[in-house]
Amino acid sequence: VAAVGALYETFLAEGFEGAMVRVPDAAYVYSRKGYHSSVLLKVKPTYDAEFRVIDWETGTRGKAASAIMIICETAAGKRFAVTPAMEIADRNALAAKMPIIEDNGKTYFDNVWRDTMITVQYAGLSVDGVPLQPRTRMQTRVDEPVAAAAAAD
C-alpha cells in the first residue's frame, strides 16, 4: 500500500490527475461495452471548499437539459457552474421552484440560496483558478450578519 501511495504522489507531482490501480491478484480484464473493469480502481484527489452562491441556471444538454445548475463565484470573481449531487427529477423540481415569487416579493432563490456559502467538491483547479468537475450536496452555511455577531460579543 505504501508503494502505491508513493507512486500516486509521484504521478500527481508530474501533473497527472491520478492513477489507476488493479485489485491485487486480479486477472487483467478488458473493458466491456465501454465500461471500466470492476478490478480497476481510479485513484484521484478530491478537494472541497466553500463558495458563494450567486445565481442558478438550467443545463442545456442531454438528460440534464432542464435540471438546475448552481452558479458560484471564486474569491477572484470567477463564475462557474456546479452540478448538484441529486437525481435529475429532484434537480428539475428545484429548478422549477427557484423563480417562484414568495410572500415578500422575492424569489425562492433570493430568499433561500442567494449569497449563501455552499460546500463544493472538485477534482482540482483550472489554470484560471476555477474548480474542475465541481459538484455539491447542496450543503450551505449562512453567515451571521456582522451587526448581529458584534452585538452578541
Model-assigned labels for residue ranges:
Residues 1-130, 134-143:
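Nucleic-acid 5′ end/cap handling module spanning
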Residues 148-153:
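Acidic, low-complexity intrinsically disordered tails
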